[in-house]
Design a protein with these regions (language model features):
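Ferredoxin-type iron-sulfur electron-transfer modules in oxidoreductases and energy-metabolism complexes
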Residues: 1-21, 106, 148, 212-213, ...
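Iron-sulfur-cluster electron-transfer modules
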Residues: 1-142, 159
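Short, flexible loop segments at boundaries between secondary-structure elements
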Residues: 20-21, 143-171, 213, 221-224, ...
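Basic- and aromatic-lined ligand-binding clefts that recognize polyanionic substrates
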Residues: 51-55, 163-217
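Local cysteine-cluster metal-coordination motifs and their immediate loop/turn environment
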Residues: 57-61, 87-98, 125-133, 176-192, ...
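Short, solvent-exposed amphipathic alpha-helices that sit
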Residues: 66-78, 195, 199-210, 220, ...
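Immediate flanking context of iron-sulfur cluster ligation sites
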Residues: 77-87, 117-118, 213-226, 248-261
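A polyampholytic, Gly/Pro-enriched intrinsically disordered region
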Residues: 102-109, 165-180, 236-246, 303-308
Length: 308
C-alpha cells in the first residue's frame, strides 16, 4: 500500500525525518551523540584495535543517554572498552514495519557496511529492535553481518556468571521485569520458525537475580505472552492515545505485582513508560538493565535519569 501511495500522514512524516536525519524522530544527525557524556564518547571512539563493538541506537542516543553511559561504565569494570559505531544510522526496522521498504533497505545496506568495516568480532546491542533487525532482517534481505550480534542482557549476564562484574550493594527492593515484545515475542522459537531465533527471557532475569536484596516479581503476562507497552513507533506517531492506554495496562500489572520499580530491556520501553508515569503522576520508577547493574556496584557512579 505504501509503495502505491496509500501511506498515512504519520508514515509520510517518519519517511521525511528518516531521509533528512537518518532517524525516525527527526533529531539532528550531527548531534546524535551530543547528549552522551564527553568522556564516555571519547573512550569508545578511535579504537581501531577493539574487537568488541557497541551500537547506541536512536532512542538511547537522543532520549536515554544514561543507558549507554551505564553500559560502558559496567563494561569498563570488566576491563572492556568497546568500539562505538560512530557513523551509525537507524537500523531500518521501524521503517520496514511501516511499509517504507526502500528507506529501510538503504539504512540496512549502509549500516551493514559500517559494521563489517569495523572488523569487530562481537557487537553489543541494547535496543531489542536493532537486535532483531541485525539478526533476522539484515540476513533475510541479503545484508549479512560478519560479526556476532549479542543483546546487552546476554553479554552482561555472561560477565556476571564469570565473575567479571560484581554486585556488592544491596538494593532491598521489590522489582518487576517487563519483557519487551521484540525480545520476548519476536525472537523466540515458539513464535517464529523460519529463521534462527534466540530466546531472551532468562538472561535479564538471571542478571537481576544476581543482585543482593532484590525480590523479583513476575507480571501476570510475561515471557512469550508479555504485553507490549505501546512504545512502537507507528503507534506513537499515529495512535498515541492508544499507546498510552496500553502502557497503563502494563503499569497496572506492575502495581498488582506489588512493585514500584520496573526493569526493562528496551530503551523505547523505558522512554514510553516513563513518559506515561510522568503524565499520570504515578509512583513508579523505570530503569534499564545496565542502570540496575550499575546501581548494585559500588565502584560505579550510577548516572541518573535525565529529562528528555
Amino acid at each position: 500500500l505504501v509503495e502505491h501511495g496509500f501511506e498515512p500522514d504519520g508514515v509520510k512524516r517518519i519517511k521525511k525525518r528518516t531521509c533528512e536525519e537518518h532517524n525516525p524522530y527527526g533529531e539532528d544527525h550531527v548531534d546524535r551523540f551530543a547528549k552522551i557524556d564527553d568522556d564516555i564518547i571519547a573512550d569508545v571512539t578511535n579504537r581501531p584495535e577493539a574487537t568488541i563493538g557497541t551500537w547506541v541506537g536512536c532512542t538511547t542516543a537522543y532520549y536515554q543517554p544514561e543507558i549507554f553511559e551505564n553500559l560502558i561504565s559496567v563494561l569498563n569494570t570488566a576491563g572492556i572498552t568497546p568500539k562505538a559505531m560512530t557513523e551509525e544510522r537507524c537500523s531500518g526496522l521501524p521503517q520496514y514495519k511501516l511499509g517504507l521498504r526502500e528507506t529501510a533497505f538503504d539504512l540496512m545496506e549502509y549500516n551493514a557496511n559500517i559494521i563489517n568495516d569495523s572488523n569487530v568480532d562481537q557487537l553489543i546491542v541494547d535496543s531489542p529492535e536493532c537486535y532483531r533487525a541485525f539478526n533476522e532482517f539484515y540476513p533475510h534481505f541479503g545484508y549479512e553481518l560478519e560479526t556476532k550480534v549479542i543483546h546487552s542482557s546476554h553479554f552482561l549476564q555472561e560477565l556476571a556468571s564469570s565473575g567479571s562484574i560484581g554486585f556488592d550493594t544491596e538494593l532491598n527492593q521489590k522489582i518487576a521485569y517487563h519483557d519487551s515484545y521484540e525480545l520476548s515475542r519476536h525472537t523466540t522459537p515458539t513464535n517464529r520458525k523460519d529463521h534462527e531465533t534466540s530466546d531472551i527471557h532468562s538472561a535479564p532475569r538471571e542478571l537481576i537475580d544476581n543482585i543482593s536484596g532484590v525480590e523479583r516479581v513476575e507480571l501476570r503476562h510475561n515471557r512469550e505472552k508479555a504485553f507490549s507497552c505501546g512504545a512502537d513507533l507507528g503507534v506513537q506517531e499515529m495512535y498515541s492515545d492508544i499507546g498510552r492506554d496500553v502502557a497503563r495496562t502494563v503499569l497496572n500489572e506492575i502495581e498488582r505485582a506489588g512493585a514500584k520499580k520496573v526493569v526493562v530491556g528496551s530503551p523505547a520501553c523505558k522512554q514510553h513508560l516513563s513518559d506515561v508515569i510522568r503524565k499520570d503522576n504515578l509512583n513508579f520508577t523505570v530503569v534499564s538493565l545496565p542502570e540496575i547493574v550499575a546501581q548494585a556496584n559500588s565502584a560505579l557512579h550510577q548516572r541518573s535519569n535525565r529529562p528528555s
